[in-house]
């Protein structure tokens, strides 16, 4: 991450040690530096602006020879079509706003990426955003980062922010309609697969809240 860190104002973890695959863990692993801060538990318009500024800096970072999204990053930022069958199945399993959910998904698939791939974090969950005195100070857990479509990094618009902060966030990242539509597809996919495979818990509560936000969003109108 040193290459990325040089281009960001917020802190990101740095590798302390790199491990190799073994019989008990068949993947490369790492130990990262610890960063101070409190995980995000509330969202404000100021945080929406902070996160937008972070993403603009991240997307402007030279991509060098970093690999594009694929199986190694669970296709975060890759083509939404990879999850087409899974999403359509989840829509039927979850039920409810089937027609509206399918309209969001179909529109997202049709909104092809118009720009070159950029750096993406891939997992901007609330727990990966650290605050200091109410402002974004660090972004952690870069295990899914890749060079790909930035739409997947806009998912916090619905998973974290309310309608007012969502509007601020969209303005901050200067998202065009197609980018925003693809982002809605990523948020829909994530919420549906949680609701289709789990019955209770904090993730289910969050997924329901995300789905409600997507259904009430007027981006399709």
Mark where each language-model region is:
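Hydrophobic packing residues in well-ordered alpha-helices of helical domains and bundles
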Residues: 47-51, 80, 101, 204-207
């Amino acid at each position: 991450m040193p290459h990325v860190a040089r281009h960001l104002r917020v802190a990101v973890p740095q590798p302390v040690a790199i491990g190799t695959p073994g019989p008990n863990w068949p993947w490369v692993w790492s130990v990262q530096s610890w960063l101070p801060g409190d995980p995000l538990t509330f969202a404000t318009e100021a945080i929406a602006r902070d996160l937008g500024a972070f993403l603009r800096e991240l997307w402007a970072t030279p991509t060098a020879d970093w690999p594009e999204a694929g199986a190694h990053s669970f296709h975060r930022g890759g083509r939404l079509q990879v999850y087409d069958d899974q999403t359509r199945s989840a829509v039927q399993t979850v039920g409810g706003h089937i027609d509206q959910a399918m309209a969001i998904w179909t529109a997202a698939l049709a909104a092809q990426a118009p720009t070159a791939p950029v750096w993406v974090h891939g997992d901007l969950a609330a727990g990966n955003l650290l605050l200091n005195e109410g402002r974004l100070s660090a972004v952690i857990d870069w295990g899914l980062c890749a060079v790909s479509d930035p739409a997947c990094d806009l998912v916090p618009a619905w998973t974290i922010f309310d309608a007012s902060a969502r509007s601020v966030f969209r303005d901050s990242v200067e998202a065009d309609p197609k980018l925003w539509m693809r982002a809605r597809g990523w948020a829909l996919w994530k919420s549906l697969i949680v609701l289709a495979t789990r019955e209770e818990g904090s993730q289910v509560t969050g997924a329901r809240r995300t789905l409600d936000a997507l259904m009430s969003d007027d981006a399709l109108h």
